[in-house]
């Protein structure tokens, strides 16, 4: 559990500041779930639509795929308000976690929670990852790259003017994470900058998305080993990820 002394030290000012940072009204505020260890003590959770945006299944996925108790380091690219990085740092005190987030308010939120929870194993870097990023910033065994790549050229200084120029910029940005033996967990949106009027691949073209993703990953010098696909529960209100070898997907 969260350190009792930490919980007792939460003042009204602490709560107000956390709410201000989490609910700041910017493009990606209230975007992630709040880490469970914190939500027990502070009610910041917004009503997130679990069929559209839910971080719990993705965290369950990476926990199923990796044994973090035997890993030394992980980097969370585009960490937002830190659901993944804070949760992993809290659950695995020996794991060195780096949360990279370009929005200053979100980065401050992660740092504030980490400080209050006494998490000395997490480093917060207020920076966007793009094609100019120093690869040493991403030095780790595992890189989490969840749903941020499609913002290349929109939410960072690359400033490209069309989806036609997106591919080489995104591939170069993703390649900054490449290192022999490093594992990358990649999820990519297909609306450029989150704009439904500017699809990178048509919404209903699932095969096209898969082919695009394969080309992009190869251009970044990675190789897809497995693919995780969402499966709805019997009630149809939540989903989980099921992992398939990528070669089976390609063959079928």
Show where each model-derived region lies.
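Class I SAM-dependent methyltransferase Rossmann-like catalytic core
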Residues: 35-57
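Conserved alpha-helix/loop element of class I SAM-dependent methyltransferases that forms part
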Residues: 51-70
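Conserved class I S-adenosyl-L-methionine
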Residues: 70-80
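Conserved SAM-binding loop of SAM-dependent methyltransferases across substrates and taxa
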Residues: 81-93
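Conserved beta-strand signature within the Rossmann-like core of class I S-adenosyl-L-methionine
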Residues: 170-171, 177-192
């Amino acid at each position: 559990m969260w350190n009792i002394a930490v919980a007792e030290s939460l003042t009204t000012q602490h709560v107000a500041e956390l709410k201000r940072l989490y609910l700041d009204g910017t493009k990606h505020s209230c975007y992630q779930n709040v880490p469970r260890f914190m939500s027990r003590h502070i009610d910041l959770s917004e009503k997130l639509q679990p069929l559209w945006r839910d971080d719990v299944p993705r965290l369950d996925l990476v926990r199923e795929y990796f044994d973090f108790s035997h890993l030394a380091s992980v980097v969370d690219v585009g960490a937002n308000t830190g659901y993944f990085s804070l949760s992993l740092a809290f659950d695995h005190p020996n794991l060195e976690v780096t949360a990279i987030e370009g929005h200053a308010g979100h980065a401050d939120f992660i740092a504030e929670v980490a400080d209050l929870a006494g998490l000395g194993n997490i480093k917060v870097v207020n920076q966007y990852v793009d094609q100019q990023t120093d690869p040493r910033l991403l030095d780790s065994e595992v890189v989490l790259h969840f749903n941020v790549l499609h913002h290349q050229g929109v939410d960072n200084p690359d400033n490209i003017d069309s989806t036609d120029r997106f591919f080489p910029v995104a591939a170069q940005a993703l390649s900054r994470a490449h290192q022999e033996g490093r594992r990358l967990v990649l999820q990519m949106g297909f609306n450029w900058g989150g704009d439904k009027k500017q699809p990178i691949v048509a919404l209903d073209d699932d095969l096209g998305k898969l082919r695009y993703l394969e080309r992009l990953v190869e251009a970044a010098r990675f190789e897809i080993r497995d693919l995780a696909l969402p499966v709805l529960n019997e009630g149809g209100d939540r989903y989980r990820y099921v992992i398939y070898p990528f070669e089976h997907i390609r063959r079928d």
